[in-house]
Amino acid sequence: LVHENVSHLMLNLVAVAVITILINRSAPPTTLAVYLLLGTIGATGAEHLLSKPPALDFVVVETRGLSGGLHGLLVGGLLALARRGDQWAVWLVIAVTLKVGSEAALGQPIIASGTVENVAVMAHLGGTLVILLAEGLQRWVDPECGAEGL
């Protein structure tokens, strides 16, 4: 398994466990997989487009982006819970959004775990924003989507 370092990998594995507990049964497994996939794509895109200097070489083997994908999975699952009336999920989405916004403004993650801090900041931002944008776009295109979400 390729990853930044052991502590970063361990943080991601702990995040998987916490996210699983928080969003368990919030949406069908395929929907959760879509959230993770879109979050990872958003994370990778943000890493390449927003890093300093922009790293537009998409040929490199990706070894990062899981933490951004996990942010996307968390936000997507929480939005699914919010659509079902869980108010705490709304507050957690706001908290995650404020966290990634703060990280982007500061240029460093709130919890440092390796040598790729700028990459992690962009990954967290990209993973979160792509889900928020996808959900918003879906509601704009199909206002009748109601509780289904992605």
Language-model region placement:
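Hydrophobic cores of alpha-helical transmembrane segments in multi-pass inner/ER membrane proteins
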Residues: 12-17, 70-79, 124-139
